[in-house]
């Protein structure tokens, strides 16, 4: 486990914008269709905004029509932690970066094959690293 989990709020406030802090560290949610990566289609990898851990490949991204970037699987097993979320009068499964505890969003069971899962992620919780062409 990374030492990122040991960082306090002052550390994260110095590294993140106010909106990123609200979403990543206080488990907020951005408005649907407002995030930077909702319509991104380029090839590459989505990293944790807080600690740069690779979380999702663009090949797993799909348009769920929900207003948030959606993926049918994480990059590899163990990079995402799941926890029951009973906030807002609902029962959902929260997803977080295993390395630093960054709130990413939620996972639902209405996704496409091959997994049937929809990892619904806030754009403010991730950053995109475009795949470099190898010549």
From Swiss-Prot:
User: Which cofactor(s) are needed, names only?
Assistant: Zn(2+)
Keywords (alphabetical) are: Metal-binding, Oxidoreductase, Zinc
A Pfam family this chain is assigned to: SelR
Top-level taxon of origin: Bacteria
Q: Which reaction does it catalyse?
A: L-methionyl-[protein] + [thioredoxin]-disulfide + H2O = L-methionyl-(R)-S-oxide-[protein] + [thioredoxin]-dithiol
In this protein, which residues make up the domain named MsrB? 9-131
- GO annotations of cellular component type: cytoplasm
Q: Biological process (GO) annotations?
A: protein repair; response to oxidative stress
Matching entries from PROSITE patterns are given as: MSRB
Catalytic site = 120 (nucleophile)
Any one Gene Ontology molecular-function term assigned to this protein's record: zinc ion binding
Co-factor note (free text):
Binds 1 zinc ion per subunit. The zinc ion is important for the structural integrity of the protein.
Give yes or no: UniProt keyword Zinc. Answer: yes
Q: Where does Zn(2+) bind?
A: 48, 51, 97, 100
Q: What is its EC number?
A: 1.8.4.12
Q: Which NCBIfam families match?
A: peptide-methionine (R)-S-oxide reductase MsrB (TIGR00357)
Q: Record's family?
A: Belongs to the MsrB Met sulfoxide reductase family.
The protein in question is named Peptide methionine sulfoxide reductase MsrB
Q: Which organism is it from?
A: Teredinibacter turnerae (strain ATCC 39867 / T7901)
Name the lineage. Bacteria, Pseudomonadati, Pseudomonadota, Gammaproteobacteria, Cellvibrionales
